[in-house]
Every structure is written in C-alpha cells, then in structure tokens.
C-alpha cells in the first residue's frame, strides 16, 4: 500500500550540528535496501556544534545538495558543493560536510543499507 511520509512524522536522527530526519529505512517497514536521510547543516556561526569527520565501513554514501552551498571534506580532497550536485563518498573514506553559505545547507543522503549505525565510525579530526 502506498503511504505518505512527511517531515513531521519522519524519525529524528539527533546528529550533532544539524537537523536530520530519516523518512525511509527498514525501521518503518520499508523492504528496500536503501536508507534516505535529509540533513540541514546550519550556517557558520550557528550555536549548534558541527559533526566531525566520520566514515561508513562497508557501504558508500551519495549526497544530493538541495539548497545552500558548502564543502565536503574527504581524505581524497575538498569538494565545493551547490544545489543539484551529487557527491559519491566511497566506503571507508573519512569525510564531513560544512556549510559555507548564510542559509542552511540542505542535503538528501542515500545509503545502500537499511541501517548505517553499525558501520559508521565518528572521529574528532582528520
């Protein structure tokens, strides 16, 4: 049966330094092997703490930029991002994304697994 999942009913992820929701995952009964998260990274100077670098062991991440502008920092280099851009982060590559604009940087993140928590490692710095 088709169903509507909106931002008001989506699971809140509680990631540091960003508003984050998970509208599609195995937890809501989705049988697809994809997890989708919407992330809003506040502008520089916001009171929230930023999320540091992290990596996903055994699976990649695809980031689609909906609005704002920023930089994805990865072990392979810095990638400036803007609306319409897609960034592919290979499995095991340490990365983080920073907002470089004066509006929230809104990202749609795709993972080819229903749960990323077991394969994600957080780091204090690069």
Predicted segment positions?
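A generic "binding-loop/recognition-motif" signal
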Residues: 58, 77, 93-94, 103
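Catalytic-core "active-site belt" of small-molecule-metabolizing enzymes
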Residues: 2-16
């Amino acid at each position: 049966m088709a169903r509507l999942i909106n931002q008001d009913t989506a699971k809140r992820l509680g990631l540091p330094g960003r508003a984050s929701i998970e509208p599609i995952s195995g937890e809501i009964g989705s049988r697809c092997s994809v997890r989708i998260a919407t992330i809003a990274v506040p502008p520089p100077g916001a009171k929230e703490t930023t999320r540091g670098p992290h990596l996903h062991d055994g699976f990649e991440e695809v980031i689609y930029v909906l609005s704002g502008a920023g930089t994805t920092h990865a072990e392979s280099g810095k990638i400036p991002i803007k609306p319409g851009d897609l960034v592919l982060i290979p499995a095991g590559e340490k990365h983080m994304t920073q907002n470089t604009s004066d509006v929230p940087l809104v990202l749609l993140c795709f993972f080819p697994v229903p749960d990323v928590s077991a394969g994600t490692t957080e780091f204090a710095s690069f």
